[in-house]
Amino acid sequence: KFINNINTYGFSVVNTNEILDIYKIVNWLVPNEYPMSTMYGLTWDIINNKDEAINLAYTDQKLDFHQDLPYYSPPPTIQVLYCLKSANQGGETILKNVYQAAILFKKDFPNEFEILKNYITTFQKVHYERDAPYHLIKKNPIMKHNKNDELIRVNWSPFVEGFTDYIDEKSWREYYDAYFIWNDFIDKTPHVTVLL
């Protein structure tokens, strides 16, 4: 059921009172692969500390729909988020299948889909005021396709986007019109809410 949920919905949730060995789960999901380390380390605690937060996720602020780490090459394909103890009352994790949303978007907004397929967006993490400074930049279209013109990934993380490559004013307007139509579309697509 766990794998079927990942294949069908793009995620799976395990509710248990047991303390799990996260490395066993990762090795079971992706045998013979080592988990990818990030700027935060291989694993890390997310602790709500507004005064010293180096990431919006470390606060109690609402996070808009996004994908984590789009500036990595390659970006993570499977993420394991493990909540041992929720520090705050309330709050919710909202998950969306952006791949499915992109397929629906292509049907409803074919011109805008093509624009987001053809224009390059810059995803970046530039942060020097930290113990391990980072300057990561990755350029990708929002709707990434392979050589056979098949959609293989949706790149969506508005709050880590940098400048788009130079384009003329008409193209710039066209891009941002499509961008905001996609933003509204993804906001309205069905989602799953996980209460922690």
Identify the function of each model-found stretch.
Residues 1-195:
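Active-site environment of non-heme Fe oxygenases that use a 2-His-1-carboxylate facial triad
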